């Protein structure tokens, strides 16, 4: 329908065995429909043959979301509490590009977004598709950084690397650029911000509540991947305590659910360690 939000909500177990079943053909079909202004979001159900990778792929191609519904509570969250954000976009093709000042930052690492990476030249190319943001929702990008001159650097400095020249950028840690399109627009809008000491929290405790909780969630994700990149002492308990300290009002109980997930994951991790070769009896 013209001048309306057109979105297909696909409920599936991810086993596409009727109609288009070839992954590449399916992705191409979704991409063509996206160009006509039709969004696609995927809600996954079932166990056993559940195909999460395929669902994530076509949802990204269709500028939508992919969620797994395993409980009545999750269904209520997706189809009631978060419905507006899951259906109505407020920004299309949102791109973030961060340039770190080598005079202040020796190393950096983006946590997550492995399937959303763009080439540097794609940032200014409005023809390159990117993610969308729904009404009432927000997106957080977390970078792990090592200050210049720190003993914690994991790699040696570049022999021929050129440090940033002193001047107007001396007090900057990074320069953030954000591009987005208004829904239906062909050209993007650019927003920039220089990150300085004014943006820095002096300690973890003084950081905003949302930032502390987001860090706990990122740490949880890293632990699920093995935790090899996490520092000593930042394990399940530290992640849980960080989340507890930033739980806030938690109107719908989502943060409390996350904290409970850390307990369940810690228990499962301990059980797996006992049954692994060379562990336990």
Which residues make up each language-model segment?
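A broadly tuned preference for mixed-charge, low-complexity surface segments
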Residues: 1, 9, 61-65, 98, ...
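Exposed acidic/Ser/Thr-rich ligand/metal-binding surfaces
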Residues: 1-94, 153-166, 249, 259-272, ...
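Amphipathic, alpha-helical segments enriched in basic
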Residues: 5, 30, 34, 54, ...
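Flexible glycine-/small-residue-rich
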Residues: 10-12, 42-44, 98-100, 143-147, ...
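Short, glycine-/Ser/Thr-/acidic-enriched flexible segments
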Residues: 13-17, 47, 73, 101-103, ...
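Polar, glycine-rich mid-to-C-terminal structural blocks
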Residues: 39, 61-138, 144
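Long, acidic serine/threonine- and proline-rich intrinsically disordered regions
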Residues: 105, 113-139, 145-281
């Amino acid at each position: 329908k013209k001048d309306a939000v057109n979105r297909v909500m696909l409920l599936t177990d991810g086993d596409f065995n009727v109609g288009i079943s070839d992954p590449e053909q399916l992705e191409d079909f979704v991409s063509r429909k996206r160009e006509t202004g039709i969004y696609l979001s995927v809600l996954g159900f079932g166990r056993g043959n559940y195909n999460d990778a395929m669902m994530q792929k076509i949802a990204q191609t269709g500028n939508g979301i992919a969620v797994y519904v395993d409980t009545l509570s999750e269904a209520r969250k997706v189809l009631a509490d978060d419905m507006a954000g899951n259906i109505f976009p407020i920004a299309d093709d949102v791109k973030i590009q961060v340039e770190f000042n080598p005079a202040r930052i020796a190393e950096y690492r983006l946590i997550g977004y492995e399937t959303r990476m763009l080439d540097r030249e794609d940032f200014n190319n409005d023809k390159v598709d990117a993610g969308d943001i729904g009404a009432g929702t927000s997106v957080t990008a977390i970078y792990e950084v090592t200050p210049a001159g720190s003993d914690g650097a994991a790699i040696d400095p570049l022999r021929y690397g050129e440090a940033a020249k002193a001047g107007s950028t001396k007090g900057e840690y990074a320069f953030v650029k954000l591009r987005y399109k208004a829904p239906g627009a062909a050209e993007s809008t650019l927003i920039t911000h220089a990150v300085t000491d004014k943006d820095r929290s002096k300690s973890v405790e003084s950081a905003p509540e949302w930032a502390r909780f987001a860090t706990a969630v990122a740490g949880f994700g890293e632990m699920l991947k093995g935790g090899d990149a996490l520092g000593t002492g930042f394990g399940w308990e530290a992640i849980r305590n960080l989340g507890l300290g930033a739980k806030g009002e938690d109107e719908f109980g989502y943060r409390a659910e996350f904290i409970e997930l850390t307990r369940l994951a810690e228990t499962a991790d301990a059980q797996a360690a006992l049954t692994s070769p060379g562990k336990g009896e």
